[in-house]
Amino acid sequence: MDKNIFHLVGMPRAGNTLLGGIINQNPNLQVSPLSPLSRVVSALHLSFEGESWENFDWTSEQDTLARKTAQAWYSDYKTKSIIDRGTWYPEVVKRLSDNPKVIILQRDIFEVFASFIKWANGNVENFIYTNVTSRKPEDVMAYLSQYGNVQTSARMIYTYQKYLEENNDIDVMYIDYKDLTGDTENIINNLYDFLEVDKFDHNFDNIKDFEFEGQKYNDTKVGSNLHKLKEGSIETSTHDIEWLFPRNLYNRWINMNELIYTPEQLEEKYNKWKY
């Protein structure tokens, strides 16, 4: 039987591991770690481009190959439904299902940077300070933007914003980090409704570390505890943004939130900013 394959994109440090830690309590619905599947399917998608193939319509074959590849990837997994986390572009996602669904995790850009910095300060051996020896916020932010998947993730979210302005063939659910951590049970219930799969009685007070098909994250290459979940009840991590980031840095990076959030979301959540 074919799996239900959904898609997860969004910002780093925005609750990806937490979402997986919760959902993966359900044996019939699992969230993957950051997966190469999106890259594999995207490569197949690109192989149909070029002048050599333009004199024949290969659309049906393209869709069939993409779907069969995704199904083959997870064919040996026991779960019925999978939320695959990856760099899923809309043009690829729409070929994998008659009713494609994408979950987009959002978090304020300064909260993302602050979360990385807090983690790095608490774990001396880490990929950030190994490459940014100055440890200055401006240098850390520039590095993470390029190598920490920050800018790529923000632009991915913006790609969906622009796509949905002109298309309605992909269903999207936005989840903000503050909502996921502050209103967890309600968000998870809404997620089940969005995915149209049977709900599960989750334990929100004792969430174990992320595990997928019996494997846990090996963070030795990036730094200890990058994907470590806090024990006990779920809490929203907060940071003193004004203390961490001087005004000049704030002004330099504030516009990236326009990639992460829709104009309506910005107006509602951050109405102090004018656009």
Task: Kindly give the residue locations of the regions a language model identified.
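Hydrophobic/aromatic beta-strand patches that form the interior of the parallel beta-sheet core
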Residues: 6, 30, 101-103, 173-175
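PAPS-dependent sulfotransferase catalytic domain
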Residues: 70, 114-194
